[in-house]
Amino acid sequence: MYEKRERYMEDAFHKISRSIVDFLTENQIGNLVVGYNKDWKQNINIGKSNNQKFVQMPFARLRSYLKYKCEMSGIRFICNEESYTSKCDALAYEPVDKHETYLGKRVKRGLFRSSVGKLINADVNGAVNILRKVVGDSEIASRVIDRGLLLSPIR
């Protein structure tokens, strides 16, 4: 049973990583930034059965597949530490580090209320903050936030 699961996971991770790299190549995207948190699976509590399934998923393997496929395709792979990225307000350019109080807040699962009065997906807020840690605020402002792509995504 263990070998079957291993083969299943390896196949799935190869397919997922290939589809991501193909998307990046087709859209002429030259960098892939992936967030990483060292202890992110240690204190998880999503129910006994889900905990067992989730903690066993080898996300480090997915990152390694992404890295080597990006390198083969000429895409720069960046793995960046992601602490405090989901709590800080990306739209208000709040510094991404530990604070006593944060400008925005998560109003319910999956929804983040920015201090500028906008509602955005909480995962999008975290992803923008991970990217801000890598490229800086000025790059994010000119390419994403000020153009409205964050609040009105192109479909």
Regions found by a protein language model. Give the residues of each.
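Positively charged, low-complexity nucleic-acid-binding target-recognition regions
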Residues: Q52-K53, M57-R155
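Substrate-contacting helices/loops that form the catalytic groove of nucleic-acid
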Residues: M1-A60, I140-R155
